[in-house]
Amino acid sequence: RTAGHKVGAETFRNIATYCQELGIQYLTIYAFSTENWKRPKDEVDTLMTLLEQYLQEAIDTMERDHIRLRVLGDTTALSPRLQQMVAETNAISTHYQGFQANICINYGGRAEILRAARLCAESGEAWTEENFASHLYSAGMPDPDLIIRPSGEVRLSNFLLWQCAYSEFYFCDTLWPDFERRDLDKAIISYQSRDRRFGGVKG
């Protein structure tokens, strides 16, 4: 699986570039969940090394290419080096507009909701959807229009549970390391054929 993770990182670069070309504003990838710590240590170590390499490359190119890259998740469990790199990429991103790529690291949808509820309660704010959402890792971003689940799995795996309330879903058998631009095209075509009513009725 280690080789697959390395190819998967390249897939992310390719798909992110393609999203920019298509005019898509946000791309969020689930890189490492809160449950992934249960995997074999060598696999976890490989994933962390890949994340360090990717973030370092991003830091080296973000200012040149005006790219926004944000890390979503509980970063306190990461190594000090990774935490520093996350802080740097998030800081650089505040200077630019346009396409934004998000990487979910040590992220879990349930944990995110619990964290937001705690912060909302501590703030003393009124319990509204807007105030609650302001304490999510994705604060300031729109909810996803489309969630793509590759690899033949038909479940959310604790991903963006609050944000996906009215998202469209697309499931495909293609493994993430094999996911290509044509696979994204198929997902977008499927999405464009949907009738999104957001709980209302068709006019």
Map each language-model feature to its residues.
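Flexible, compositionally biased loop and terminal segments
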Residues: R1-G203
